[in-house]
């Protein structure tokens, strides 16, 4: 059975690291179809030639696979001449097994697009795509920082120092001052004098925790290098944070940035990194369910013979999924309805599944907040009573700043 075409002029692009193969399918006024095939290199002059050829063809649709990062530069070249290409999931365009060539792949893409069988993936605006470089590298630096802090803790334990037992945060102001003093070779009484009076542990316990079997020269050297690396990473992350926030404000994302912070579990940087990934315009997704599917937070759909089976979450945007899990962890410890939801889920599903389920719920709520341009509302919270409290949650303080 022949499939009736929807588009009359379509270009399919098979993109590789060093080569781009294009196939244009053009329907003539008499109903006949012609095929035009071209090959381009990977350099800027080649991408410019590709854009000029596409303009000459005048396509209704230009489609390409999301092949790693190779699609980005051809996409930008086409975008510069006013052509918004479709970037499609490679799993949705798998050809029938047989003879496989670059030309055949490009023609297959064009044929599917011509019949209206493809759906374009969400591609963020150019300004957000640019800011993703900052946000994602910032997340990578955060992972390196956490790893270095763990190494420091492990090395102190190796030397017999149990400071992590008596302080809640080994990298807090007081604990870091004591660690630096130990590295510098200060005596235990001198180190103990740096302990803050606000620490819950007694001076006797802190004194015992600072006792080491032996801090060797190798211990001191590695501890000194790790501490220097930690401080360098913290300084670098602060620069990334400042640049990301400045760029978002200049791009006009100040309002959604403020709205996101009214939800429990989301701080300023979390809101900024989420906004860079999903944007502020929810109409591009169409519904909260589609957004959750794109992120990969929705439950798997696995049904056979009328029986629904438990399914794993699908693959999606790993950067957003990681952020949502962090938000859910924080919201599960806040004074809000999300905490009650997490505790109810935790009894039935366990901690890890409950975090994913709560992250899914938060994402759907975020969609509604950004779509309606409104702040988060928790029906179980007495906002007037909490706003006058000295220890009001941060997300309530953010809401009060709006008014």
Predicted regions and their residues:
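A detector of single, family-specific signature residues
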Residues: 1-401
